[in-house]
Amino acid sequence: MTLLALGINHKTAPVALRERVTFSPDTLDQALDSLLAQPMVQGGVVLSTCNRTELYLSVEEQDNLHEALIRWLCEYHNLNEEELRTSVYWHQDNDAVSHLMRVASGLDSLVLGEPQILGQVKKAFADSQKGHLKASELERMFQKSFSVAKRVRTETDIGASAVSVAFAACTLARQIFESLSTVTVLLVGAGETIELVARHLREHKVKHMIIANRTRERAQVLADEVGAEVIALSDIDERLKDADIIISSTASPLPIIGKGMVERALKSRRNQPMLLVDIAVPRDVEPEVGKLANAYLYSVDDLQSIISHNLAQRKAAAVQAETIVEQESGEFMAWLRAQSASETIREYRGQAEQVRDDLTAKAMAALEQGGDPQVIMQDLAWKLTNRLIHAPTKSLQQAARNGDDERLTILRNSLGLE
């Protein structure tokens, strides 16, 4: 039995290829059935995200295994083998275990240390269990990887610092305001970055969110998801005074929030401080706003410096995380080897017990027929000894005939002779 991990990701393949190798949730069951129908595959898990498609497999060793699996992947997705072959990576046994642990821990992600991948790996594993996963070694590998990912999160700072603009904006807000549960946030725009910001704010239980956008329909979809109020861009001047935090990210070619607008808002707020985070390029907030007392303006460049600092911290944490992965993968492979030995021991013990039972039954039958107990017991002992040492004796003789001193030494040690 061999453990394999093969696939493509953002490092090895462009999005144009990655999107053609994905497995949709609707067809995943069919894909797993097809994969497990391959004669060499004993068990499998398919992980398919926007940045990676990977197969984790328990397989029987055979010639051309690599080619057979790539052929299956290409046939399933109607791809040219040459087109895919140069982008596929391949890990076996300890390397496969280490790879899965790194993936689950966020060490192989586009955004180093991102936590979402662990949920995606868990879902892939859960989907494979619905009548598909057949290899206990593979199941144990995934369970171990989940515990390793948790250990990495607990023992390192891999996920402690913001490394995305959206997350950095929210982190900044949480650093300045002791609790977001008492503040009102005005979000200007409704694009992807603002969507991420809104979700982060919801997770931190912000008191109230207002979304201002050029098109109400797009803003309303996001507002319904996060429980926010929607206003038009033209209403910002009137509502700015209600906001403790303003986070803006639009595609407007001109500033949306001017110095005069903020001055009026501060006057209405009796100079209670306002945090303005402008993550738009071109800028949504006039730079002069930063000169106003009680108006604290941060641009995307300010956030980028925070992100760069935090990324350096994550990279330092990743070194510690890699040490954890190396240790845990080594322990898992030791367990796997022990399991293999346990199976051999069970077979050997079962064989010996069968010999014992057969000879004991014959001895009991002889006793019931009135045979001499002493003779019967001596015969039983002699036959039992011969039967049990027959196979080791043949192995010793074969090693001696072949001049295999190393094998002789191993056999002697195994038999307790040295």
UniProtKB/Swiss-Prot annotation:
One Pfam short name: GlutR_N
Annotated positions for site Important for activity: 99
Active site: 50
Keyword annotations of the record: NADP, Oxidoreductase, Porphyrin biosynthesis
Reaction equations catalysed: (S)-4-amino-5-oxopentanoate + tRNA(Glu) + NADP(+) = L-glutamyl-tRNA(Glu) + NADPH + H(+)
GO terms for biological process, alphabetical: protoporphyrinogen IX biosynthetic process from glutamate
Membrane-spanning residues: none
EC numbers for this chain: 1.2.1.70
HAMAP family the UniProt entry points to: Glu_tRNA_reductase
Miscellaneous remark of the record: During catalysis, the active site Cys acts as a nucleophile attacking the alpha-carbonyl group of tRNA-bound glutamate with the formation of a thioester intermediate between enzyme and glutamate, and the concomitant release of tRNA(Glu). The thioester intermediate is finally reduced by direct hydride transfer from NADPH, to form the product GSA.
Protein name: Glutamyl-tRNA reductase
Native species: Enterobacter sp. (strain 638)
Species lineage: Bacteria, Pseudomonadati, Pseudomonadota, Gammaproteobacteria, Enterobacterales
